[in-house]
Design a protein with these regions (language model features):
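Hydrophobic N-terminal alpha-helices or hydrophobic patches in metabolic proteins across all domains
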Residues: 1-134
């Protein structure tokens, strides 16, 4: 039997306020990795331009779908770079409504529950202004 992180990992018992996310891309990395839907492994999609990187750890929420037939994306804010394929519990603080092509491609904004430096953040408005600009 083959294990697939998208289909075989729980979203968490406290969803939608607290969810589990699987990190694909650590923050400040210029590589765009994606989960291969069939194998469950990460593939290198592309390398981003030198001035572009991810301001937060980027991944997906298991057992979810967005309009683009991919799992729902999540940006997990933490003071550390979280390694790819790490399962992270995160407090949801907001959503970035996005359209890719003609399809909804929302990004859930969350903070890692086990990162004490972000325990005070309960809503996206609690983030420092400089983070929102990034």
């Amino acid at each position: 039997m083959k294990f697939n992180p998208w289909h075989d990992v729980s979203i968490g018992d406290n969803a939608p306020g607290v969810v589990k996310g699987i990190i694909e891309i650590p923050k400040n990395v210029r590589a765009k990795y994606e989960l291969d839907k069939e194998s469950g492994m990460l593939i290198l999609d592309r390398v981003l331009f030198a001035s572009i990187n991810y301001p937060a750890n980027y991944g997906f929420i298991p057992r979810t779908y967005c309009d683009d037939d991919d799992p729902l994306d999540i940006l997990v804010i933490s003071q550390i770079d979280i390694v790819p394929m790490c399962l992270v519990e995160a407090n949801v603080i907001g959503v970035m409504r996005m359209i890719d092509g003609d399809e909804m491609d929302d990004k859930i904004i969350a903070v890692a529950t086990n990162d004490m430096s972000f325990n005070h953040v309960k809503d996206i408005s609690d983030l420092p202004a400089h983070w929102l600009i990034e």
